[in-house]
Every structure is written in structure tokens, then in C-alpha cells.
């Protein structure tokens, strides 16, 4: 059978194997964020009926931002298979951005033609003393 020494050796190996099976999770000292200025963001485009399109965005800065919000929204309409410029609004337009705040979000509405296909390009941004950053996204929506 087993001698006392062999039994201790097998038990030690078994204990070491158990310790090796315990999961170890890495710890990151840096918080997860999109950039130095943008902590998180979201963008979406939805048809609300009767040709109206809701363009929804929000931006959460990593701190108090000098300027934060949507940098640009550009809308194209599909005409005979070709994307044709329909309208755009920049960061200085009504409801697009805010100054000296941590967060900004809003919904901008575009009045299109019911049943038509639209391409909407949305770019969010955040700007502070150390610089600025932006994130674009393109959506396709039937009004």
C-alpha cells in the first residue's frame, strides 16, 4: 500500500492542483472608456411614422467637457438607387450640443417622406482642454 511519505506527497500534489484551478481575475487600474474625453456614448435612428425620423444620441464625458454632444448629423435620401444629400446640422445647431457639462443627450427629428429610404450619418464628440474626440456611425432607415 501507500507509505506515509507517499501519501503526503500525493496529498500535496492534489492540493497544488486545486490551487491551480482557482480562477484569477486581472485587475485594470485604468477605467474602461472610449477615449480620454468620451466615457461612453450611444446613437440610434428610428422611424416614428408619417415620414418622421428620430435621431437619438447621448455622450458621457470622462469629466466636465468644454463642449459635448453631436458634432454633425447628415441625412441622405435614396433616389433611384443613388444617395442624394437631403439635409445636415452641425454642433452649433439647436439641440446639438452643450457647453461646460459632463453629459449631453437629445433627440433631433428629421421630417422626410413616408416610405422613402434614408441614410443618416451621426457623429458625436466631446472636447476639453486636453483635446477632442469623436465617434461616427451610419444608419439606414425607412421613413
Feature locations, PLM:
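Low-complexity, Ser/Thr/Pro-rich intrinsically disordered linker/stalk segments at domain junctions
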Residues: 25-143
Amino acid at each position: 500500500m501507500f507509505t506515509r511519505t507517499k501519501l503526503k506527497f500525493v496529498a500535496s500534489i492534489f492540493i497544488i492542483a486545486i490551487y491551480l484551478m482557482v480562477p484569477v481575475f486581472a485587475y485594470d487600474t485604468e477605467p474602461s472608456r472610449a477615449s480620454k474625453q468620451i466615457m461612453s456614448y450611444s446613437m440610434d435612428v428610428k422611424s416614428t411614422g408619417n415620414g418622421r425620423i428620430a435621431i437619438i444620441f447621448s455622450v458621457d464625458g470622462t469629466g466636465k467637457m468644454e463642449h459635448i454632444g453631436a458634432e454633425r448629423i447628415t441625412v441622405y435620401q435614396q433616389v433611384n438607387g443613388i444617395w442624394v444629400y437631403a439635409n445636415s446640422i452641425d454642433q452649433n445647431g439647436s439641440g446639438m450640443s452643450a457647453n461646460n457639462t459632463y453629459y449631453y443627450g437629445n433627440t433631433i427629428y428629421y421630417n422626410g417622406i413616408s416610405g422613402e429610404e434614408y441614410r443618416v450619418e451621426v457623429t458625436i464628440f466631446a472636447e476639453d482642454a486636453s483635446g477632442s474626440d469623436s465617434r461616427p456611425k451610419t444608419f439606414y432607415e425607412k421613413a
